[in-house]
Amino acid sequence: MSKPTAVLFCPGRGSYTKDELGFVGRTLRPGPVTDALNACDDWRRSQNRPLLREIDGAERFRPGLHLDGENAAELIYFGTMAQLEHLRERYQIVAVAGNSLGWYTALPASGALDPTSGWRLVATMAALQKQVKGGQLLTTVVDEDWQPNAQLQVAVMAVLDALQDRGADTFCDYSIRLGGHEVLAGTEAAMTELLTHLPKVKVGDREFPFRLAGHGPFHTKLCTAVSEQATQMLADLPMRAPACHLIDGFGNVHSPWSADPQELLRYTTTQQVLETFDFSACVRTAMREFQPDVLLCAGPGGSLRAPVGHCVLREGWRGLHDKQALFGSGLVVTD
């Protein structure tokens, strides 16, 4: 019996929470990913930093430790890569995409990097991003039923435009297009203004907007210095053509027979760092180009399930237009 086909989505920052404590240790198997984790912990030991295995295996979740940018990035990376080996036993993965940090995971998950080089990419970018002042927040432009709310969309754009018109001190922009959610990023002054002036919305038990702890102004021009340093530091990263299709943050497909490794590396350290990451476009491409049996949201956690679901409903994919029908369809899965 053939396996169901799937497009795999790798999660970004914020997906390793207290409920995921121990995820890496529970999921990891011997092999290249374990070898990469060994290399990671050897490096951490040499720098007198806590070992990632110890952080993952801690008795309790400590936000200051587990949500630290460098720790969080590596926990998420190794969590996804460890789970990938289990997912491949159940699904035929025809394409891979990622949300923000998840792009770095998507590269080794697709075979464009080996797992140890993928860790080096994640660790390097996380360290560089910590140097940038500013932040991200999350707001929403959908209602309780995951339907688009045009008034919210207009209101968010109006606040962004007003702050941009005020000059560099309040620079802000779309950072990630995340289904029915929007991740906005900017200077510290812009974060204060956005939290004050954006519409206050409650969807389920979540109140929007809210600041994303430990996040910098990712995917904006505020990260120009990060891009320049990453381009130099990662020039020798052994990028290769992926073994399966790879969808980038513009929704473009890089195929095994046509991908340019140097272009993948250039995109990873330049446009991907500096321009809006359109995860919604990734999901649209997955649906339109690959028509998989399922849209597979990798762990840790299930943070991508709602954004992917928003995109399915907006597309009307497979005739789905309401949340309850989507939940019953089995099209968006997490394991």
Residues covered by each model-derived region:
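Short active-site oxyanion
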Residues: 92-95, 180-182, 291-295
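Alpha/beta catalytic cores of group-transfer enzymes, especially the acyltransferase/condensing modules
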Residues: 110-260
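Gly/Ala-rich beta-loop-alpha elbow adjacent to hydrolase catalytic centers
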Residues: 94-106, 110
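A short acidic (Asp/Glu
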Residues: 108, 222, 305-309
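Acyltransferase/transacylase module recognition
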Residues: 2-88, 238-335
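Gly/Ser/Thr-rich loops at beta-strand to alpha-helix junctions
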Residues: 14-15, 103, 188, 216-219, ...
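Short, charge-rich binding segments
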Residues: 85-90, 97-99
